[in-house]
Regions:
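ATP-binding pocket architecture of kinase catalytic cores
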Residues: 1-79, 83, 90-93, 118
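Alpha-helix N-cap/helix-start motif at coil-to-helix transitions, marked by capping-box chemistry
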Residues: 17, 25, 47, 75-82, ...
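Active-site acidic catalytic loop and adjacent metal/ATP-binding pocket
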Residues: 21, 56, 110-171, 181-182
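Glycan-recognition and catalytic cores of secretory/periplasmic carbohydrate-active enzymes
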Residues: 63, 71-78, 125, 131, ...
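All-alpha amphipathic helical-bundle segments outside canonical DNA-binding/catalytic cores
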Residues: 69-75, 205-217
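Active-site activation/catalytic loop segments of kinase-like enzymes and analogous catalytic loops
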Residues: 82-92, 164-203, 218-234
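Conserved P-loop NTPase mechanochemical-coupling segment
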Residues: 90-103
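Short amphipathic alpha-helical coiled-coil/interface segments
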Residues: 105-109
Length: 235
């Protein structure tokens, strides 16, 4: 990814046999922290993150990246929906709903999964692109009074689960982030920005863009609820 222009940490040394790796230190300033410290720069920071997202969404398969062998297909999407049913509904909430009702929920999930998996124009997705996985690095301090310095850069981490999917998936991860809630008005403005700036990538009408945004946001949120439900149930 780094060789193809995506801002990821540089790896200086790795030894797969021992599991040892030495990589670039990105510091401790995440986008999540920067948003809290700079409430007047929220739109600017998110717009930069959206433009950064386009860098990997433009990537073409060069035969080297394993992410292009994986996809958000029906099987993967249903695994995440089933994870929610098993670990949040059954595990955390201890639902007493009859199996027939849970099967009806699963049938509804399957329809959504089939719609999300149907489009052929899938692209490289980070899969967990939220404010805690974006680091701000620069040669100058990030001054809350001045906003981001001119020589800072956003780096991404935690991209090991990357796979092919719709461009809306990473956008949902970013704008429907439980760690950094946005107002509906601000989210709508950032969606407008993403639609206009990303036309060459998504190649959708606004109605199509919004349709897949809504489906992706629902699926991504249910997936997150499954993860948090499992964590809470385990204590």
């Amino acid at each position: 990814l780094r060789e193809r222009g995506v801002a990821v940490p540089e790896i200086f040394f790795s030894d797969p046999a021992t599991g040892v790796m030495l990589q670039q230190d990105l510091g401790d300033l995440s986008l999540n922290q920067a948003l809290k410290e700079n409430p007047d720069k929220v739109d600017l920071l998110y717009q930069d993150a959206i433009l950064h997202m386009f860098n990997w969404q433009r990537l073409a398969d060069d035969g080297q990246c394993p992410a292009f062998r994986l996809s958000f297909d029906v099987e993967k999407l249903m695994f995440e929906f089933d994870f929610f049913i098993d670990h949040t509904l059954r595990g955390y909430y201890k639902t007493t709903a009859p199996d027939a009702e849970l099967k009806e929920i699963r049938r509804a999930f399957l329809k959504i999964a089939e719609k999300l998996a149907a489009p052929a124009n899938k692209i490289f997705t980070h899969r967990d692109y939220h404010s805690r996985n974006i680091m701000l690095v620069g040669s100058e301090p990030f001054d809350s009074a001045q906003g981001p310095p001119p020589h800072y850069r956003q780096f991404i981490i935690d991209f090991q689960d990357a796979r092919l999917g719709l461009m809306q998936y990473d956008l949902c991860s970013l704008l429907c982030d439980a760690y950094a809630p946005l107002s509906l008005e601000r989210r709508a403005g950032l969606l407008d920005f993403a639609f206009e700036q990303g036309k060459e990538i998504h190649r959708q009408t606004r109605a199509e863009f919004d349709h897949y945004w809504q489906l992706s946001a629902f699926q991504r949120t249910v997936k997150a609820m499954g993860t948090f439900g499992r964590q809470a149930a385990l204590g």
